[in-house]
Amino acid sequence: MNLPEQGEAAKRVLCGANSYIEKYFFNPRFQNLPEEVQESLQKIAVVYTEEIGGIFILQFDEDGKLDMASIKEDDDFLYDPIGAELKRKQIFKDYKELFSKLEEYYAGLLKIEKEKSKS
């Protein structure tokens, strides 16, 4: 899987963390989210990469549903694919309400952006 670097796919990325370079990214497109939400997202992404390794991306799919992607480099033999799937399921369970609200927020954001582009 390639990281979305530009275009529509990149605009759908909410946040991500990279264990290889120890960096966290938050998409400025979503800067109007409350600080508490931004902090929760950072915690989710950073803890995931600390426990599992690799690169973690939280993004909206084409239907506006929140999805997670986990990517590893070819030579990363410490990456835990089984743990990655278990952690992914745990995150969806633990943050179900937050993710539902984020999907609503994203739908509203798309609607506003669409209306702005018409005028």
Residue map of PLM features:
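Negatively charged, low-complexity tracts enriched in Asp/Glu with abundant Ser/Thr
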Residues: 1-51
